[in-house]
Amino acid sequence: MKVIGSLKSAKVRDKDCRIVRRKGRIYVINKKNPRFKARQGY
């Protein structure tokens, strides 16, 4: 999982990317291609 400053670029990498919010953090998840997972930095 990558930790990045802005999820906008991570969101558009693949059409199956979804943004979810868990415990106050914002994540990008992708069920079909899990290597696109990312988390907002702060």
Swiss-Prot record:
Source domain of life: Bacteria
GO cellular component: ribonucleoprotein complex; ribosome
Coiled-coil annotated residue ranges, if any: none
Keywords carried by this UniProt record: Ribonucleoprotein, Ribosomal protein
Any single biological process term in GO: translation
Entry-linked PROSITE patterns: RIBOSOMAL_L36
Gene Ontology terms for molecular function: structural constituent of ribosome
Family: Belongs to the bacterial ribosomal protein bL36 family.
Protein name: Large ribosomal subunit protein bL36
Gene name tied to this protein: rpmJ
